[in-house]
């Protein structure tokens, strides 16, 4: 999963019709639980771009998107925020959100 920062974020999201951004921190236990789930789903859904943003390294992005708790996932469609989730989601719940992102 590619890590984004303030300089790369907007271009990456604009270039990705469907994208999921994981706002995380290296010290966050729940973030560490979510990472392998996202890595697995990334391999199963080549039509969705997956990115990560370290909130400690990119605090302006965290503020811009109102990140108050981590992990937070933001799903984007055509460059626009579609839905935001907070906390660890199970794989079936993530797949359901991706289906919603693709079809709604």
Specify the residue positions occupied by each region the protein language model found.
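Conserved helix-turn-beta segment immediately C-terminal to the redox Cys motif
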Residues: 16-18, 35-53
């Amino acid at each position: 999963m590619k890590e984004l920062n303030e300089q790369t974020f907007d271009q990456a999201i604009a270039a990705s019709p469907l994208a999921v951004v994981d706002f995380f921190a290296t010290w966050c236990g729940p973030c560490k639980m979510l990472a392998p789930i996202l890595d697995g789903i990334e391999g199963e859904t080549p039509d969705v771009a997956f990115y990560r943003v370290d909130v400690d390294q990119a605090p302006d992005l965290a503020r811009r998107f109102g990140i108050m708790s981590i992990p937070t996932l933001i799903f984007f469609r055509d460059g626009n925020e579609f839905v935001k989730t907070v906390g660890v989601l199970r794989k079936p719940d993530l797949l359901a959100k991706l289906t919603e992102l693709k079809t709604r």
